[in-house]
Each structure stands twice: as structure tokens, then as C-alpha cells.
Amino acid sequence: MIGNHLRSYTINHALPVILKSDDVPVICHANEGMGPLVMSFTQFGVETDMMLAFGLAGASICTENSAIEKELWSSLAERQGWTNVAQDARLAQQLLNRDAGIRQVRAFQHTVDYFKKQYNYDFGEGTCPKIKLEVEELLLLVGATSALQALQNDVASGRLINVDMAIPPKIVHAMACLDNTKWWGFPKSVQAALTVVIPESPEAEAQGWKDLQSATEFGEKVGMRLSHATYAVVASIKGRDDHLRDALKRFEAVPKEKINPDYLLLDQLADIVMRHFADRYWMRSEGHRAPTENYSKFWDEKEQPSAELNGMLDNM
């Protein structure tokens, strides 16, 4: 059956190549184009939940990027006093946030369906399944991330999606099913994120911030910066510009040659998220998006003369 062959080829051969790609728009649009074809195989009994979860998560990226552009235009127009333009851009942004969030909710639901069918596992509840394949672990990670992204887009849209608020605690529990070391410290960063966003006490929140920073440090060692994006998301939600600046600096400080080439696509996705936060922060403070490079060198940071220059001046 062609559907089963397509599934096998996609998971065993195409996916590893896709994960090594740094061309996010190509991957995004390819997922948009292939989605209906994959859906059509469901009626013939082909297992499509995994492919659809990955595909919808990927397809949401371009829509979310368009939403960010509208948000920036709205902020800029508002600063210029162009009220109608600002309002129109904001409405367009909310609709795009809705569309991106719907895709992400569907990606999460396909993840939930996959683990229910294959392992009889209710996502984020009870005992973790004994996952057999690495690609299934990746699916769990991507599905959980999609749910959190959907929640962000829901809020940004003005709750046009109405994402179930019972999902975040399930995500925390599901992250415990993944090996934190194997997956670059990202599972712990997600757990720490929700500790900070919904803290049980001031002490728990303080520890959550430390855990987020520790996750970024571990990610730097193994060449993956997903935890940096989590750190930035939480800093933005909590309105902590000090932590946002720290997250941006940590992210930019990692040399490109250290990035894990086998998962370059995931790092590029994190890069897009960080660029979005940098653009928002610069727009809010300076009235334009972040510089093309060195966006974590902020406008209020004075250039410090080098020790060598100081020595030369002392000898004059």
C-alpha cells in the first residue's frame, strides 16, 4: 500500500534529512503542501497521526511568523500615531495567531491520539509508556511544544481558540517521560517554565528561574539552544526584561559551529523564536526591530575600552 510506504519513507529517510536542514520556510511550506495527501491515507487504515503531528507543527511556523510581522507593524504604526493602521494590523495578527494556534492544537491532538493508540497512554497522565523508538520520543517533545505554542497563540489572538487550560499540567508530567540528558535539557526547561509561570511560592519561582538558566547552560554544552527559547518565553510572560536580556545574550553567545548538525532545524526554530522576542523588545524600546546581528548588545550598554587601549593611553 502506497500510504504505508510513504509513512515508512518519511519517518526513516526523509525526517533525518529534514532535521538537518536550516531552511525553515521550505520545510514549513512543504508541510502545508503535503498535509492533505497524508490526511487522505487515514481512510485506508494507514497510521498517519505521527506524520500529521510533525506536519502540522511545521506548517504552523510560517503562519506564526506572519503574525509576528503584523504585530511589529501594529506596534510601529501605533508609535507613529497611525491609529487605523495599527488597529488593522493588530486584527490581522490576531487572526493569524488563531490560525497558527489551531494547527498547533491539531498537532498536539494527533500526538495524543498516537500514544493512545500505540501505547494506550493518556498523554500526561499515569505511568509513562516504555517508548520503543527515538522518533516517538521526538514526537512527544514536538507535540508537547506545539501545545504550549498553541496556548501562547490563543492568548495573543484574544482567546479565539480557547485552548484547554488543563493541558499545561499534562505537559509537565509528559516531560518526565523523556531523558533530560538525551534531549538537551529541554524537558527540565519546560517543567521549570511552568513552575515560574504558575509558582506555588516565591521560593519555588526563584528555583524555577535557576533551573531555566541551568537548562540553557546544559544546552550550550551539547549544542542545542531550545531551552534558551523556553527561558525567553517565560521571561516575556512574566514581564522580566532582565531575564529576557539574559536569555538573548546566552543564545547569541553560542558559536554557530557548536550547534548539533543532526538537529539543525530545531535550533533554527529556536533562533526564529529568539529573533521574535528581540524584535519585540527593540521595537518597544527603540521604535524599530532588532539589528540584523548582535541584537543582544542593547542600546543602553556603553562600549567599554579594551585593556590594551587603556594601556596605550596610560603610556602616552
Predicted regions located by residue number:
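Generic structural signal for hydrophobic core residues of well-folded globular domains
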Residues: 60-64, 151, 195-199, 235-236
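N-terminal alpha-helical interaction modules that lie
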Residues: 1-184, 241-316
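Alpha-solenoid helical repeat scaffolds
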Residues: 186-190, 224-230, 260-266
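Glycine/small-residue-rich hydrophobic helix-like segments
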Residues: 209-250
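Alpha-helical adaptor scaffolds
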Residues: 180, 184-218, 235
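Generic local-structure boundary detector
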Residues: 198-205, 238, 285, 289-292
